[in-house]
Amino acid sequence: NLVHGEGETGDALIREDVDHICFTGSAEVGQHIRKVAAESWHKTTSCEMGSKSACIIFDDVEMSLALEASIASAFKLSGQRCVSSGRILVQRSIYDEFAEKFALEASKLKTGDPFKYNLGSSGCPDGIVWESLIPNEENYYGPIINEQGFNKVKHYNELVASDPKAEVLLSPAYSVNGKSFYSTPMVYKTEWRDCDMGYLRNEVFGPHVAIIPFDTIDDAIRIYNDTEYGLAVGILTNDFRKARIMRDECEAGMIYWNGGSIAAESHLAFGGVKKSGNGFPSAARTFRAVTHEVSWTVNHADKLTFPQGMK
């Protein structure tokens, strides 16, 4: 059953006599759901929430692979995926070269309506024949989800522009078409640091990318882990040893090696750690989340028997 509504509707649903709540959304709402669930003895939760995911690029990888993978990871779906790489960590020996080329590639991305329409008098709104919608390949990504999300992206972009410690490589342009809100990419260079402006550690959820240098593998691990989130990280290196170390030390629920993003593999669990959530709502883990185990002992003897040591 689908029940549509906003906050009040959702709050009523989670207070019903249900055994398990599976939620995908913001960390703030997820935290509220877990508090409500804690008031019950039996209610459990699986929450997949926000992230500050990253792509980590070592200097032994091909530049073309690094660019292709990081562009896709950062800007697919307007950067509005929980696994989008809002941070790109690059080894210092290739940092300047990569940043320049990344900004150039990002500047070529077109944003706009993701569909083409066959207009006609079909009785549909605005005369659009919905069955004839086809992807518009000219545009790499579409709009920000709504005005609230659009204003959030603009807010963080403006913080970056006002910060003397951030070097802006590509400034965004904005446009509004009815209820569609568009932003071109924001790309900037900065050292990892304590930043009270929030844009380095908070989830922006839009085409907003910080390119951050690191020197050693230990630096990369420290920088990646230095947020409240722990959802996804991409490792780009030709060195299997480095990849395994990163896999073991990065605080993330999903790690991909030499790819553009997490693959939609039905047999793999999808979820994170820390503020990114609890539980992995996919694959076999889903069934374990919404069921409970029962220990069933069967006596096949003709008389009553007891476990060893019990009389």
Language model features with spans:
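Conserved residues at the C-terminal ends of beta-strands
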Residues: 5-6, 24, 237, 258
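Short, well-ordered alpha-helical microsegments
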Residues: 10, 30-31, 243
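Short helix-initiation/N-cap motifs at beta->coil->alpha
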Residues: 6-9, 51, 215-217
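Conserved C-terminal structural/oligomerization subdomain of aldehyde/semialdehyde dehydrogenase
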Residues: 56, 123-124, 133-134, 175, ...
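Buried hydrophobic positions in well-ordered alpha/beta secondary-structure cores of metabolic enzymes
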Residues: 20-21, 51, 91, 102, ...
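ALDH superfamily catalytic-core signature
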Residues: 17-20, 28-194, 257, 305-306
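A structured beta-alpha segment of the ubiquitous adenosine-cofactor-binding alpha/beta core
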Residues: 1-20
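Short catalytic-loop micro-motif centered on adjacent basic/acidic residues
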Residues: 1, 20-23, 56, 232-234
